[in-house]
Design a protein with these regions (language model features):
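Conserved small/polar residues in nucleotide/adenosyl-binding loops
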Residues: 250-253
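Carbohydrate-interacting/catalytic domains
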Residues: 237, 255
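Charged, heptad-repeat coiled-coil alpha-helices that serve as long linker/dimerization "arms"
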Residues: 226-230, 241-248
Length: 255
């Protein structure tokens, strides 16, 4: 009950295969384009059996920790909306917008270094408003206006808006945040902000965690006090450049 896309097929047992699954590509294979090839020879020659953006989807009910409210026809309250881009510098690990309007701007300013999941060259910075650029079916400025209109209708019931960046790097190009399951530590801070049980540091870009407010128990050797400072740093010079870049991008979108 799983759907795979852009993967290779092992024709002997009709199972999916992709680079990274294991180091044994099937000999009797069909690549992601539908070509029947010898997988071992094909990959040895430098070719890829699967597309770099191969995916799978499975029923949500397969998740062992799914909420009992998942299928509630009345819906559930949304407390937080979380945007995120892939940035090596500039953007801190997490920050909260000042308001819904500011949060809409934060979402519109999302940008990422391109990966295999996006068309084009890898590592090039591209604007990706709300991470919706490949999926937005109408003019992006109208999409932003829709968000602002939603805020007017929601009033004080509007969710709080946050931005995360798991990909900040140190001066040697190494990721400073461990990611994966440790991202729950940031979500824990976000939940506490929504509950109003924790304060935050007001900065020019939004509200940031106060030092020590993100639970780093168990990863102190990896995320040291110095690393924590770097993860939450707001470099004003970099952000001035970011503002100018966004002004240029908004002028482009507005044409």
């Amino acid at each position: 009950n799983t759907i795979f896309t852009n993967v290779a097929i092992n024709n002997d047992d009709m199972t999916a295969w992709w680079e990274g699954l294991d180091k044994n590509p099937p000999e009797n294979a069909t690549d992601w384009k539908g070509n029947k090839v010898n997988g071992k020879e094909y990959t040895a020659a430098g070719n890829k059996l699967a597309h770099p953006n191969s995916r799978f989807t499975a029923p949500a009910q397969n998740c062992p920790c799914i909420s009992p409210e998942f299928n509630n026809p009345q819906g559930v309250p949304i407390s937080a909306i979380i945007f995120g881009g892939r940035r090596a510098a500039t953007t801190p690990l997490v920050y909260q917008s000042f308001s819904w309007q500011h949060g809409t701007y934060v979402g519109s300013a999302v940008s990422s270094e391109t990966t295999a999941a996006a068309t084009g060259a890898v590592g090039v910075l591209r604007h990706d408003p709300m991470a919706m650029k490949p999926f937005c079916g109408y003019h992006m400025a109208d999409y932003w206006a829709h968000w602002l209109d939603m805020g007017k209708k929601l009033g004080d019931k509007a969710p709080k808006i946050f931005n995360v960046n798991w990909f900040k790097q140190d001066e040697n190009g190494n990721f400073m945040w461990p990611g994966f399951g440790d991202n729950m530590r940031v979500l824990d801070w976000i939940i506490k902000r929504c509950e109003g049980t924790i304060d935050a540091e007001k900065t020019p870009i939004g509200y940031l965690p106060k030092k020590g407010d993100i639970n780093l128990k168990g990863i102190e050797d990896e995320v040291t006090s110095e690393v924590e400072d770097k993860l939450l740093a707001v470099d004003r010079d970099l952000w001035k450049k970011e503002v100018e870049e966004m002004r240029s991008e908004e002028r482009r979108v507005g044409k």
